[in-house]
Structure formats: structure tokens, C-alpha cells
Curated annotation (Swiss-Prot):
This is Chloroplastic group IIB intron splicing facilitator CRS2, chloroplastic. Disulfide bonds: none annotated. Changing residue 108 to T: Loss of interaction with CAF1 and CAF2. The keyword Coiled coil does not apply. The lineage of its organism: Eukaryota, Viridiplantae, Streptophyta, Embryophyta, Tracheophyta. TRNA binds at residues 74, 124, 126, 172.
Amino acid sequence: MSLLAAAIPSTSSHFSAPFLPSFRMPRKSLTAPLHRIRRPRPFTVVSSVPDPAAGPVEYTPWLIAGLGNPGNKYYGTRHNVGFEMVDRIAAEEGITMNTIQSKSLLGIGSIGEVPVLVVKPQSYMNYSGEAIGPLAAYYQVPLRHILLIYDDTSLPNGVLRLQKKGGHGRHNGLQNVIEHLDGRREFPRLSIGIGSPPGKMDPRAFLLQKFSSEERVQIDTALEQGVDAVRTLVLKGFSGSTERFNLVQKYKFHRV
């Protein structure tokens, strides 16, 4: 039984596990033992409708995963801004990331009354799918509620973009996640602009480089804005506010 199912009161029949597309996962991912630092807090499912006769309310969990590399030497580098965003989200929502499962460091909590799983894969960037695929299956998270957060060299430093779906854009971590979701690409993503390598600089060296002081200010501002964007997405879904957010982000550094 999943933690989500365990959290559903036995007196209610209104909640059911969400539909989950089939994922291709290595057998070893399913049978690997779980090593917990502390006992995780189960998903909490709470109805916002005070009168049960008013109708059933379903709260489908979200899996919010930031992509990056584990280890202190990667902390603060361009390629790890996905990790930083997840850390900010967890801190703002009071979620403690204290569980190791499926090659991930994760925390279980909620945004508003919506259950969320915040995740930092520990399998290294290029193998992020080995962590996210099994977690999505174990917690029965539908594809439309898997939010990936990652760095994007096609966007100026500190510019964010929120999308319902898309390709991998030659991002190795994102590509590996798609492969472990059976080639499916219809999941949300929040990309964080880190700029592009100057001149003939090696792209790998650029990704593993830390931000300049000016760039760091822009990234910190973007992380704050990203937390608000994720909260709005989880509570309200994609809407006109998403389009306005992307438009504001696109021109945030333009001078008129």
C-alpha cells in the first residue's frame, strides 16, 4: 500500500488512486531496499468542502523534482539550480527532506492542502530518470503532475519559463527522465535560465562553474519568483496567470 493510500481515511470512499501511465523501469529499481534517515510523513489528504454532501473532492499528489548533481563540489554551480529551487520550495512550505528512496533525497508534505513530494535525485544528472520513474510509479503520481525543474542554457541568466510539456532540448538529465517515463513528454517543467557559454568555452566547464556575484543576485531573485510560480501551479493548474508569468519573465531584463 502506498503512503498516499494509507493517508486516506477509511470512512470516506470519495478518494481513489489517480490513473498512472505505464512506465518502463529496471527491475532493480523496484526491488532496491529503502534506507530511511527518518520515518517519512505520509501524504495528508484534506477536503476543503466542509459538507461531505457537497460532493467528492480529489487531491492528486504532485512530484516536484529538481535536477542536479549530489555532492558539495557541485553546490552553487549552474547545473544545480534545480536542486536550489527544490530546497527553496521545501523551506517555504515547511517540508523536511529527510528520506532516501529510489536513489533520491525526498520530503513529503503539502502546498496548501495538495500533497506534494519534493525530490532531489542522487543518481547524478545524466541518470535522473532512474530516480524519478520509480518514484512516480510508487506514489501513483500521474504524468501531468510530475514537475521537473532544471537549468536551461537557451534562456538568459535568471529568466524562468513554465511549460505544460516539451522535448528535452539536449538536456541530458531531462532526456533520461523522458526515457524512464516510457518516452512520454507530457509533463510540466520549470526551466531556469543560466545563460550560455561565452565564446569558445567548453559547455561542460560552463555548467560546472559557479555564478558571478551579479549572476547570483539574478538567480536568487528567480528562485523566489519560482517558488511563487510553483505554488500557483499546484493550487490552480495552468491558466492565464501562467501565460502572464512567462511573458513577464521573458522581458524582465529588457529596458524601454
